[in-house]
Each structure stands twice: as C-alpha cells, then as structure tokens.
Amino acid sequence: MERRKKQNEGLLSVYPPPPWYSRYFTDENVAKVKDLQSSDNSQLLEAPLKYLTPPSPPEAGAYHNFGDVWQVNDKLATLEDLGITQVYDGAAIRGEGQESGARVLELKKLTKSLLLAFVELTGIMGVSPEQFPAKFEHVRVLLINIHHILNEYRPHQARESLVTLMQQQINDKKQHVENIRQSCDKVRDTIRVLSKQFDQVDEFEETGGVTTEEVKYVSGKDKDLLVVKMAEQVL
C-alpha cells in the first residue's frame, strides 16, 4: 500500500521519477532483447525482458498517463455523465441548432443568469450567509454549463484553425512563386539589355570605330580617353 502511494505521488509530481521497471534496462538485457528480436524467439515476452519492449498502442478503453486517465476515443462527455444538472435546452442546440443561432442564444441566457446569480450571491453574503453554499453551487452549475457549450465548439474550432493554417501555407507558396517569377523577369531583362549592348559593340567594331585592338597600342591619358569614347558610343 505504501509503495503504491509513493508511485501515485511520483506520477503526479512535476518531474516524476523513473518507472520501477527501469532497473531492467541493463546492457545484458538489452543485448538479449536484440538477439531475441533477430531470431523471433517467443521468450521475449517473458519477464523481465518484456519490460524492454514498448507495449502496443491501445485501441479501445482508457489509459493512464502521468497519473491521469485518458480515453482512447476522446469525446466530450455529457453533463449527465458528469453528474451535473443541465440547465439549458439541449434539443435546441443540436441538429438544426448547430447551423442556427441557438447555441449563441443559450450562451447569452446562461451569461445573464450567471450575472444575476452572482449579484444574488453577493447580497446573500451580507444578509443570510448560511444560504451561501446553495447559491454558490448554482453559480458553479451555470459556469459548467457555459463551458460545456463552449467545448462543443472545439471540433469546429479545430477544423477552422486547420483551414486557416492551410490557406496561409497556400498563400505563402503563391508568394514564393510570384517572387521567383519576378526574379526570372529581372534576369531576362538584364540578359536582354546585355545582349543589346553586345550587338552595339559588334556594330561599333564593324563600322570602323575605335576598337579594343586600337586601345592596346595607346597608353596613358590617351588610352583612358579612348575607353571613355568607346563606352559612350556603346551606351
């Protein structure tokens, strides 16, 4: 009993200690597991070697994780399953109500009821404090009902969040494609300009102007002037 209590305290701590079966993870056992896995030996299921292989994922029921119980098929429990009184009209927000404003209307009603209950609670505390537990329980039930309706929106919120994320990724990819297209256009324009300049150089040399061969035989200041002259005629 004492051992189980310590294990539960460890599971609920911020940094839980290593599980009790961690002592079986020795070099010798790890080597045995590798040999058995390679030979498909059924002795692998025997203790303590079975603790060295991860269990198969659960397909149904519940599982424990850090001291809490989680359902494999996660679904929102009803207020009746939780033992909470349902104060809103459940039939109005199901079926056709999912597409209408029934949920919003019920939330507004519950919010107004919560404000009224809080005002009554503050008044009771000054006049009749012994009625505090009943009124406080009423406030608690109203809050749980509000949260339950909001939690029913979670699947819709998840779908819309996924749609928004995917749309953002599509927009980013389109923007990247557009940036690449603009860069390609700039490269084409640059190549076109350079091609025209080379054509002008060829035409310049064919007409008997100052050529690069003539520049080789000129030195000093005269050479600089000839280069400037060539650049001006090309541009």
Swiss-Prot record:
Keyword annotations of the record? Activator, Nucleus, Transcription, Transcription regulation
Q: Name one GO biological process term.
A: RNA polymerase II preinitiation complex assembly
Give a GO molecular function annotation for the protein: transcription coactivator activity
Primary location class: nucleus
Q: Which GO terms describe its cellular component?
A: core mediator complex; mediator complex
User: Where is this gene product found?
Assistant: Nucleus
Specify whether Transcription regulation is a keyword of the entry.
yes
| Superkingdom of source | Eukaryota
The entry sums up its family as follows: Belongs to the Mediator complex subunit 7 family.
Listed under subunit, the entry gives:
Component of the Mediator complex.
**Primary role:** Component of the Mediator complex, a coactivator involved in the regulated transcription of nearly all RNA polymerase II-dependent genes. Mediator functions as a bridge to convey information from gene-specific regulatory proteins to the basal RNA polymerase II transcription machinery. Mediator is recruited to promoters by direct interactions with regulatory proteins and serves as a scaffold for the assembly of a functional preinitiation complex with RNA polymerase II and the general transcription factors.
Question: What is the designated name of this protein?
Answer: Mediator of RNA polymerase II transcription subunit 7
- Tell me the lineage of the source organism: Eukaryota, Fungi, Dikarya, Ascomycota, Saccharomycotina
